[in-house]
From Swiss-Prot:
Protein name: Proprotein convertase subtilisin/kexin type 9
Primary role: Crucial player in the regulation of plasma cholesterol homeostasis. Binds to low-density lipid receptor family members: low density lipoprotein receptor (LDLR), very low density lipoprotein receptor (VLDLR), apolipoprotein E receptor (LRP1/APOER) and apolipoprotein receptor 2 (LRP8/APOER2), and promotes their degradation in intracellular acidic compartments. Acts via a non-proteolytic mechanism to enhance the degradation of the hepatic LDLR through a clathrin LDLRAP1/ARH-mediated pathway.
Activity modulation: Its proteolytic activity is autoinhibited by the non-covalent binding of the propeptide to the catalytic domain. Inhibited by EGTA.
Sugar-bearing residue positions: N531
Residue ranges constituting the Inhibitor I9 domain according to the UniProt record: 75-147
Pfam families assigned: Inhibitor_I9, PCSK9_C1, PCSK9_C2, PCSK9_C3, Peptidase_S8
Active-site residues from the entry: D184 (charge relay system), H224 (charge relay system), S384 (charge relay system)
Signal peptide coordinates: 1-28
Length: 690
């Protein structure tokens, strides 16, 4: 007792006053935070046991949701630096509690992350943020925020290749080798559609429902999760009828959850993977919240551990890059279309769009299991349903080829999608070029796909308008950057170049004086055993122009790019190709630096294809033939009217300004120049490399 009295004499005055609150207030505090008193008793010993860190300015950063109504102030995810040891995570949390107590504040550590990322979840006053940001090992702190379910049988026919279509949907493989984790509401697991196919885990991390009169009817609480489980693996209305599922409850009966709850759910999956490794694993996240750095980082960690993550793009008729986890590059992000392959409209809102969307899938009036009874069905709409379709397709593809990486799976999903079927007028004008015109479909066959050259186009975020502003587009870790281009709506840009960053090539685009910003466009391909390099020629300064070659005989040209250090009155003349004579060279303006992407890989061969027009038009295109894949796209000759060149599926598109306002002449005709590549059969390629 004497020892306890001694410790009490050390308590800060504000804490002492807090403990002397009236009985009603004390009981309320005890009900809400039952272990606070135990924490207070330990604070003094914590202070004695922890050496004070030297005072220093905060180098960590603070982040919070851009949408104020979704913010949850008072709860924060403290993310520690990458190299932080497990013991240091717990020590940092204790240090925060001890230093907060000295200032008269109570804190509560809600969760310590170890397996997903180093850090912890803490309940504390926002007044302590400055203190927390100065703690050793802290990388950044993010305020918790809300996430929401994204839902407001033509669908099975739409995703099935014609050769499999019949009176009944019968996929080639049911996804029996794959396990799908669903982060959603609770599930009615005894529904006939999913009975025996879904295991409801004991994981639950949800906020309280809003409103004191909310009644938690089972049918309401289970509605969203039950429907999506049926879409993924239902006996009658499911995509991957053989896939097994595990459900984690991260959304409450109103379809609302938190970023922190989702993080803890993802860590639960990671722990399960570590304890009992299984075959291919797909995680379906049919939810969306405001942009979250920590949620995107967690998705990256899980993806690099071999997990395929599929998420809803969101139902806000907005740029998907403003939401998480939709904006995470490692996640397969899915928008929603209707039976006519058009974007889904949900009242005044609808599917999200933009460069962060990978593809679209059926998401309107989708028939699935209803939680009203064990034999009931209901139709629901939204990007949640679209994501469930892609999760089912992914499960089936992984069941056939379980060794597929995330990059290989994504490339196959894109390659086998239905193309150019969506009416782009539905999207805002500035988003049409960025949004993929792809609707998911099952591959007709995987035979021979291993030697197919798969490529996709990755757009960067739009740069700022300053002269020195740049934009960077990156490929996935398992992909090769084969070419780099740029696009500016004003036409004022200083070009682009491929450069090394963090051991990987990236595509960097440069804005010009008076420009409105620029986008970088990377052509990212799967090219196993590739040896690629970038050859650069500085400005020639005189003569016909600057030119650069792929010097090695076994290397082929996959892309050309150029950039200017100094503006030429805001114009840009990108590199051109001379297919006659020396096809392995890029030729550009004499005042520009020219870059050639040169690669060697088994069976790789490339050729140049050009399509010109006698007078300027707003757009000119050239496409690679069947069996060839577009790797590079540029403009010829590249006058000041050219806005940029970019790849859309297997077509090179060159855009120019509205010719009615530019006073163009026939001397300013332009052409689209494509580099088309393919990989020949293994036996033939092996002979050539010997």
């Amino acid at each position: 007792m004497g020892t306890v009295s001694s410790r009490r004499s050390w308590w800060p005055l504000p804490l002492l006053l807090l403990l002397l609150l009236g009985p009603a207030g004390a009981r309320a505090q005890e009900d809400e935070d039952g272990d606070y008193e135990e924490l207070v008793l330990a604070l003094r010993s914590e202070e004695d046991g922890l050496a004070e860190a030297p005072e220093h300015g905060a180098t960590a950063t603070f982040h919070r949701c851009a949408k104020d109504p979704w913010r949850l102030p008072g709860t924060y995810v403290v993310v520690l630096k990458e190299e932080t040891h497990r013991s240091q995570s717990e020590r940092t949390a204790r240090r925060l509690q001890a230093q907060a107590a000295r200032r008269g504040y109570l804190t509560k550590i809600l969760h310590v992350f170890h397996d997903l990322l180093p850090g912890f979840l803490v309940k504390m006053s926002g007044d302590l943020l400055e203190l927390a940001l100065k703690l050793p090992h802290v990388d950044y702190i993010e305020e918790d925020s809300s996430v929401f379910a994204q839902s407001i049988p033509w669908n099975l026919e739409r995703i099935t290749p014609p050769r499999y279509r019949a009176d009944e949907y019968q996929p080639p493989d049911g996804g029996s080798l794959v396990e799908v984790y669903l982060l959603d509401t609770s599930i009615q697991s005894d529904h006939r559609e999913i009975e025996g196919r879904v295991m409801v885990t004991d994981f639950e991390n949800v906020p309280e429902e809003d409103g004191t009169r909310f009644h938690r009817q089972a049918s309401k609480c289970d509605s969203h999760g039950t429907h999506l489980a049926g879409v993924v693996s239902g006996r009658d209305a499911g995509v991957a009828k053989g896939a097994s599922m595990r459900s984690l409850r991260v959304l409450n009966c109103q379809g609302k959850g938190t970023v922190s709850g989702t993080l803890i759910g993802l860590e639960f999956i990671r722990k399960s993977q570590l304890v009992q490794p299984v075959g291919p694993l797909v995680v379906l996240m049919p939810l969306a919240g405001g942009y979250s750095r920590v949620l995107n980082a967690a998705c990256q960690r899980l993806a690099r551990a071999g997990v395929v993550l599929v998420t809803a793009a969101g139902n806000f008729r907005d740029d998907a890059c403003l939401y998480s986890p939709a904006s995470a590059p490692e996640v397969i992000t899915v928008g929603a279309t209707n039976a006519q392959d058009q974007p889904v409209t949900l009242g005044t809102l609808g599917t999200n769009f933009g460069r962060c969307v990978d593809l679209f899938a059926p998401g309107e009036d989708i028939i699935g299991a209803s939680s009203d009874c064990s034999t009931c069905f209901v139709s629901q709409s939204g990007t949640s349903q679209a994501a469930a379709h892609v999760a089912g397709i992914a499960a089936m593809m992984l069941s056939v080829e379980p060794e597929l990486t995330l990059a290989e799976l994504r490339q196959r999903l894109i390659h086998f999608s239905a193309k150019d079927v969506i009416n782009e007028v539905w999207f805002p004008e500035d988003q049409r070029v960025l949004t993929p015109n792809l609707v998911a479909a099952l591959p007709p066959s995987t035979h021979g796909a291993g030697w197919q050259l798969f490529c996709r186009t990755v757009w960067s975020a739009h740069s700022g308008p300053t002269r020195m502003a740049t934009a960077i587009a990156r490929c996935a870790p398992d992909e090769e950057l084969l070419s780099c281009s740029s696009f500016s709506r004003s036409g004022k840009r200083r070009g682009e170049r491929m450069e090394a960053q963090g051991g990987k090539l990236v595509c960097r685009a440069h804005n010009a004086f008076g420009g409105e910003g620029v986008c970088a466009i990377a052509r990212c391909c799967l090219l196993p055993q590739a040896n690629c390099s970038v050859h650069t020629a500085p400005p020639a300064g005189s003569g016909m122009g600057t030119r650069v070659l792929c010097h090695q005989q076994v290397h082929v040209l996959t892309g050309c790019s150029s950039h200017w250090e100094v503006e030429d009155l805001g114009t840009h003349k990108p590199p051109v190709l001379r297919p006659r004579g020396q096809p392995n060279q890029c030729v550009g303006h004499r005042e520009a630096s020219i870059h050639a992407s040169c690669c060697r890989a088994p069976g790789l061969e490339c050729k140049v294809k050009e399509h010109g027009i006698p007078a300027p038009q707003e757009q000119v295109t050239v496409a690679c033939e069947e069996g060839w894949t577009l790797t590079g796209c540029s403009a010829l000759p590249g006058t000041s009217h050219v806005l940029g060149a970019y790849a859309v599926d297997n077509t090179c598109v060159v855009r120019s300004r509205d010719i009615s306002t530019t006073g163009s002449t026939s001397e300013e005709a332009m052409a689209a120049v494509a580099i088309c590549c393919r990989r020949r059969h293994l036996a033939q390629a092996s002979q050539e490399l010997q």
